Structure formats: C-alpha cells, structure tokens
C-alpha cells in the first residue's frame, strides 16, 4: 500500500508547483502519494500542524521555522525551498492617517498569530527602525481576510504581508502600502518532524526534486505568468514580475550564515 506524505504550505504562488506536480502525476515514481494542504494561518499554523502530526513536512518561512526549532520543537530543516528573499509590504487601511513607516511606532499591528511571519517580520522591521519593541501591540487576525476586517474596523492599523499577494487590495484602494521590508535570508525552508523523516527518508528527495523540476518548467513556460495570475487572482503583470524574480532552490546545502543571522 502506498504511504501518504502530507505537505503544508501557505495558499500563495510560491507553492503553485506542488499543485501542478500533483495534477501532472509527478510524484508517482517517488513511492508516496503526496497530499498538499493549504494553511491560510501561515507559518505559525504549520508549526502547530507539525507538532500535532497533521502534516509531515511544512513549507515554512525561514524565520518562523528557525524560531520553532529554537523553542524545542525537534523539527529538522531539510533544505531551502525558496532562496530568493521575501518582500513584505507594510500596509494600512485606505483611510488611515499613517503615510510613512516612520509614523508606525506604538500603533497596533495585525498578525496571523504569534510566531508567524507577519509577527516576526513586524518585530524585525521595528528593530531596524529603532522602535521600542517591548512597546509593540499585536492583534491576532488568523489570516489575510482577518487582517482586512481588522484594518477596516480600526482594531489594528498596520499589516505586513507578501506584497504580490496584497497587490490586488492595494490596486482596489482597500489597502495602502506605505513601505516595504526585504529580509536578508531565504524566504522559505522545508521543515519536517522526525517521525516523517524516519518514515519517508527514502522518498523525500525524489518528491522535492520533482517539485523543483515542476517549478523550473513553470518559469520556462510561455504561459507561466498567466497561469499564476489566474490561480491566485493577481494581475498578469504582477505575476510576471514575481515569476521573474523568484528562485526555487535546487540543492540541499543549508546556508549556515543566513540561518545564524535569522
């Protein structure tokens, strides 16, 4: 009987190759059946999923995966998944009085959950700007839809999220983007709990190699941008710009210096 490998990831274009690979039967020769599960709650929710054994591997933001391990999860990092850095948009509601990141100190920040990327990068951003981190206020909103409600209601005033995914909200006038934060390390890593590592040790590399091959084919295809745009509700121009800049990682060497910085 074929075993099942359960993979968790955010419902964003970075993970589109997993859906394409499943659809194309790219994992059939790997010896496992791959099930991809969306985690709108982000890296914090995936950390819980690994801990509760709801998923076997997770495509986590690097900073969140490292924090989870430092907190004693016992998870392992298999490889870098996306080696290009993530650009976080700093967003406010359309009617907000905030016009610059310099004005953000002391304002309430929407986060998907504590330990998530939206939480950790808000802290990184505040530290880089010299703000008092101990005075930061956070409002847990679960996901992007929760952030939209929270900013509209005025419960939170600031929200950091991957800028291409929020571009439609900026274009529509619901959000304003007042700044960006680019983090100096790879965007995503592949994390695995030890039970899955023991159970699927022989299949994991074949699965991950198949995903990289699918990602490379997507980038090389003439209609790649239009497919991404349709799948994630963004403009084709934004999809093309994102696809041109993203770098899925092929090798299995962990960038020790970057992880130390995290």
Model-assigned labels for residue ranges:
Residues 200-262:
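Secondary-structure end/capping motifs
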Residues 139, 145-228:
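Pocket-lining segment of extracytoplasmic ligand-binding domains
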Residues 45, 67-68, 86, 144, ...:
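Short secondary-structure boundary/hinge segments and terminal tails
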């Amino acid at each position: 009987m074929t075993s099942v490998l359960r993979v968790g990831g955010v419902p964003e274009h970075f993970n589109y190759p997993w859906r394409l690979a499943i659809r194309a039967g790219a994992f059939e020769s790997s010896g496992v059946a791959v099930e991809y599960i969306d985690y709108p709650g982000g890296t914090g929710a995936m950390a819980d999923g690994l801990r509760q054994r709801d998923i076997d591997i997770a495509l986590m933001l690097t900073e969140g995966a490292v924090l989870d391990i430092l907190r004693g999860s016992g998870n392992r990092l298999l490889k870098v998944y996306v080696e290009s850095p993530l650009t976080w948009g700093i967003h406010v509601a359309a009617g907000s009085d905030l016009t610059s990141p310099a004005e953000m100190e002391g304002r309430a920040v929407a986060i998907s959950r504590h330990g998530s990327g939206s939480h950790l990068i808000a802290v990184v951003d505040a530290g880089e700007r010299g703000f008092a981190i101990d005075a930061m206020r956070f409002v847990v909103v679960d996901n992007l839809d929760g952030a939209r409600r929270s900013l509209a209601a005025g419960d939170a005033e600031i929200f950091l999220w991957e800028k291409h995914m929020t571009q439609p909200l900026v274009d529509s006038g619901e959000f304003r983007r007042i700044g960006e934060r680019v983090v100096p390390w790879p965007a995503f890593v592949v994390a695995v709990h030890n039970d899955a590592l023991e159970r699927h040790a022989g299949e994991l590399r074949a699965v991950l190699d198949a995903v990289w091959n699918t990602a490379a084919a997507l980038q090389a295809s003439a209609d790649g941008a239009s497919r991404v745009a349709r799948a994630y509700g963004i403009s084709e121009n934004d999809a093309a710009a994102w696809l041109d800049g993203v770098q899925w990682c092929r090798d299995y060497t962990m960038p020790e210096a970057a992880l130390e910085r995290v």
